[in-house]
């Protein structure tokens, strides 16, 4: 619950910014990902339930070392599971691992994360690199970069 609360603080309330790649969101829950949810009227408690079921449980957060729970969960919410796993896989490989960077949180990735003892700061640095690369590819997103950068360092 504590980790979910921190993510909720970063996500804020209702937003429908046409320039935001997330589209219509409330508490970080996107209409595009959850078309059956009344996003505009979503309550904080409703968002917490979605976070727990869809982003925490389904993404196997607790299969990772506890030090990485918060950042992995936050990346799943903000960037999607596949990108989150790819960032962690790259961080493991940057420490001498040899994972296929495929975005799958399978037994080989889980074992390699544990074996490599990849540090939180290493994952943060790969996350910041992802955002920088994204803004390079899509300059229109530069207005979001500072917030993403700050979030990457705080989580």
Q: What do these predicted regions represent?
A:
Residues 1-155:
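Cell-wall polysaccharide-cleaving catalytic domain and substrate-binding groove, primarily
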